[in-house]
């Protein structure tokens, strides 16, 4: 049983959905980054979505761009796989990477997925690679048992949703709206119609992302039929607002994640 199967079994047993925060590895610095990830897990995060620093994050809004562009913290892409940077092995929860194709190509596709396996990564979402351009990544992902994750946009055709369902595994990244990420632009609710279409194609469990910043949005996502919610910009903003007070940063992150996780409980 892999960590995805274990997670979904546990959530089903407790009548809950998943809450998944996003952070960039090495933000604001390597040492505090590890403390942040540990705090997120201790506060109740069901999984972690991790970004690898990259100078041109096309799909991310200004908040997350600020974190990903902070390469001067000393965190280079290759460092993210080194032992002292990996918060992964000790965690009994799924770890996702959200990244861009150039970082996969940089060291070779096979080598990249091998490094993911060695670091304890469960899945990879390449944000700028749609399903119809993903064929070259599939064999290496399968070889190293890394779940390929694909995005289901709200304007997708049935053909696109079918390919997302057939090629993806682990979970499906369901967009609450078009555009780039950011808590500045609220998620569009509800998403019943898109979820129903994905159900028709037996897509992997759906998690709603983009603009998720409040517990009520998480609750609405779960009530709409999503398996969980992902929040990135709201988490990154907390980090940015407490750069000079690392302990206050961790305390606010703990409060935020606890509240968001509590909102995943299904009403009986």
UniProtKB/Swiss-Prot annotation:
Task: Identify the pathway.
Answer: Amino-acid biosynthesis; L-tryptophan biosynthesis; L-tryptophan from chorismate: step 5/5
Q: Does the keyword section mention Lyase?
A: yes
The family classification in the record reads:
Belongs to the TrpA family.
Q: Which EC number(s) does UniProt give?
A: 4.2.1.20
The kind of enzyme this is, by top-level EC class, is lyase
Q: What GO molecular functions are on record for this protein? A: tryptophan synthase activity
From the Swiss-Prot or TrEMBL record, give the protein name. Answer: Tryptophan synthase alpha chain
Organism of provenance: Vibrio metschnikovii
The gene is: trpA
The active site lies at 49, 60
Classification from the root reads: Bacteria, Pseudomonadati, Pseudomonadota, Gammaproteobacteria, Vibrionales
């Amino acid at each position: 049983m892999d960590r995805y199967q274990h997670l979904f079994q546990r959530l089903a047993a407790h009548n809950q959905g998943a809450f998944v925060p996003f952070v960039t590895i090495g933000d604001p610095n390597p040492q505090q980054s590890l403390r942040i990830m540990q705090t997120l897990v201790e506060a109740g995060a069901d999984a972690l979505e991790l970004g690898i620093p990259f100078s041109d994050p096309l799909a991310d809004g200004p908040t997350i761009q600020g974190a990903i562009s902070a390469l001067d913290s000393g965190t280079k892409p290759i460092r993210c796989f080194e032992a002292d940077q990996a918060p992964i092995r000790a965690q009994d929860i799924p770890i996702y990477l959200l990244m861009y194709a150039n970082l996969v190509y940089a060291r070779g596709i096979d080598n990249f997925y091998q490094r993911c396996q060695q670091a304890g990564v469960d899945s990879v979402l390449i944000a700028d690679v749609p399903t119809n351009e993903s064929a070259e990544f599939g064999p290496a992902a399968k070889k190293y048992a890394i779940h390929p994750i694909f995005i289901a946009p709200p304007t997708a055709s049935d053909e696109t949703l079918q390919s997302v369902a057939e090629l993806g595994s682990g979970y499906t990244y369901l967009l609450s709206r078009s555009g780039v990420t950011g808590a500045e632009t609220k998620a569009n609710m509800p998403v019943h119609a898109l979820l129903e279409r994905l159900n028709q194609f037996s897509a992997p469990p759906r998690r709603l992302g983009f603009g998720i910043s409040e517990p009520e949005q998480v609750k609405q996502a779960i009530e709409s039929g999503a398996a969980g919610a992902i929040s990135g910009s709201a988490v990154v903003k907390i980090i940015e607002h407490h750069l000079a007070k690392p302990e206050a940063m961790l305390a606010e992150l703990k409060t935020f994640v606890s509240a968001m996780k509590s909102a995943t409980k299904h009403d009986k």
